[in-house]
């Protein structure tokens, strides 16, 4: 299950030889932001670890990092145990967990040391959602503690009070359709929270990750902090690069498919994010895969705030980034490799076990056929969803062969061997440990 040699000419009579002429070979892609088997808005995501990891591997993703949520009153160990029960023996790609911390009493602070020692080295903090969010003082204390221990946090940045006020404003105006969604969470709601987080992180002298960045305004805050010497990492998602907020005005509740938080933005935000990818200002592209069926989405037909927020993406990320990034010249093939594999491996304590093709690294490999042409549709997807948010989208390139821990797991979008995934224990954040 490891790569034994990387050489120009290897002669081994017992080895099976795979001809990959005219193909690219990538280290297995890593999606460091998925939500499988997650309870949201009175329902549970359509994809659990069984179906979600099948979807991942079918598109070329060999490792996912999901979120184990510590609900208030639980220990961190209880949260991790809950998520291991959801994932163990069911995963067709490798998996790890970020720990989402919902409160920060002294007992949780003490427990962090053991958790990090056991290989969970990244954490999720929310600045929004009443059941999960931490106040600013708690965020400061968590960041200081993580910096002591070699952990790092990714943060969902939206101003909770402003979102509540703006949602209420839309309701008072009688705007209950999906068209009101972007107005209820405008770009400055993200930018303010990003700015506040960066100041908290500066006070804590802590590195920080802003997850699912969606706005030009938020990007500017990060660029400004970096100019002051602050250590900030950025993640964005394909939907913020390829879709815009005009979809919320589509008729017949089509807009419901695209209700996510933060919302889809304007074309100018897309452009700013693409430029930031090109100049390496953004480190990773993940998906925030959080899928729901049309029936689940329909819970909010009369009130957009009741639509479960999230969309699928774990399966389509590689082909969308190849088609819309590499083929268009917006990013290079090497940048795609860094954004989808090497950088998340480094940031989340998996490098050089993953994220590189080198002797001793895990044999997670993707053989990429750059010439394949096909069309995305609900019919040809593996994810457990009855629609495709990129329906009819012509794409180029395909994960022709996907190897997980040295075994062929998928070919041309079809899973050929299930349940090859192993749990990944990760190292502390490198600059601190």
Language-model regions, residue ranges each:
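Divalent metal-coordination and catalytic microenvironments
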Residues: 1, 22, 33, 56, ...
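Histidine-rich, glycine-flanked metal-binding segment
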Residues: 1-27
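Alpha-helical scaffold segments that flank or form the walls of functional sites
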Residues: 23, 42-96, 102-121, 138-148, ...
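Histidine-centered catalytic micro-motifs
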Residues: 28-41, 153-158, 287
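Gly-rich Lys/Arg/Thr-decorated short loops/hinges at beta-loop-alpha junctions or inter-strand turns
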Residues: 31-34, 61-66, 92, 171-182
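Histidine/acidic residue-rich metal-binding segments in metalloenzymes
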Residues: 107-285
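His/Asp/Glu-enriched, well-ordered alpha-helical/loop segment
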Residues: 178-207, 257-258, 283-285, 291-372
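C-terminal cap of metal-dependent C-N hydrolases
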Residues: 299-303, 359-425
